[in-house]
Curated annotation (Swiss-Prot):
The protein's name: Ribonuclease
TM segment ranges: none
Keywords for this protein: Endonuclease, Hydrolase, Nuclease, Secreted
Species of origin: Heyndrickxia coagulans
Pfam families assigned to the protein according to its UniProt record, in alphabetical order: Ribonuclease
EC number annotated for this UniProt entry: 3.1.27.-
Superkingdom field: Bacteria
Chain's role: Hydrolyzes phosphodiester bonds in RNA, poly- and oligoribonucleotides resulting in 3'-nucleoside monophosphates via 2',3'-cyclophosphate intermediates.
Family statement drawn from the similarity comment of this UniProt entry: Belongs to the ribonuclease N1/T1 family.
Keyword Membrane: no
Length: 109
């Protein structure tokens, strides 16, 4: 089953400490032939979503702590170009969502 909703992915992360199996990193997707500018992820990796890459938090909109790293995952992806919905999660399991491509965040776990 594809798990790609905010609550579904957040619950999975808390329970299993990793993303669901339908997530692949940008480099894994690229190796399969994904080209972001073509919006072809669903063609080259059916049922997959992009997730697991580092989120740098350059703007400092998420809380920082010594040793904390952030990763991101696409949410609600079906096909075509990626949307603005992302789940961002920390190495100590803080989980935030953004529906406007990182402009604002709301903590959900």
């Amino acid at each position: 089953a594809v798990i790609n909703t905010f609550d579904g992915v957040a619950d999975y992360l808390i329970r299993y400490k990793r993303l669901p199996d339908n997530y692949i990193t940008k480099s894994q997707a690229s190796a399969l032939g994904w080209v972001a500018s073509k919006g072809n992820l669903a063609e080259v990796a059916p049922g997959k979503s992009i997730g697991g890459d580092v989120f740098s938090n350059r703007e400092g909109r998420l809380p920082s702590a010594s040793g904390r790293t952030w990763r991101e995952a696409d949410i609600n992806y079906v096909s075509g170009f990626r949307n603005a919905d992302r789940l961002v999660y920390s190495s100590d399991w803080l989980i935030y969502k953004t529906t406007d491509h990182y402009a604002t965040f709301a903590r959900i776990r």
